[in-house]
Amino acid sequence: METRMGKIYSDALGREMEYIRYGSSGKPFFAVPSQDGRYFDFANFGMVDAVADYIEQGRIQIISFDTIDRETWSNEGGDPAARMQLHEKWYHYVCDELYPHVMAETGYSGRAGTTGCSMGAYHAANFFFRRPDLFD
């Protein structure tokens, strides 16, 4: 299976963010790791292996990317307004920066899927409900 690591500078967050893409063709699925997770956790917990046949058949691609949950959702001592604003910046990074970058990189012209586990599932559902123009 083709695996490609990438970094993209986020203007919204003011930093580089990492991601990894599994597969080279098929519908892209944006996979959000569990709470406080990193881009490599989706594979480390066996989720990529679970769909490896679909990836190898060229039916799907998995794009797993970093969250900033430690600075937002899990930062219980932080200022609630600042945490919320930072989370919204991360949301805009995913939708306005990472999504177009990945879609251009893959050449896929339809809407992408979104998936995740635990808090990642919450984030995935949030992308789906807030941006049905991007995710189906």
Language model: regions and residue ranges:
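Non-catalytic cap/lid and distal C-terminal segments of serine-dependent acyl enzymes
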Residues: M1-D136
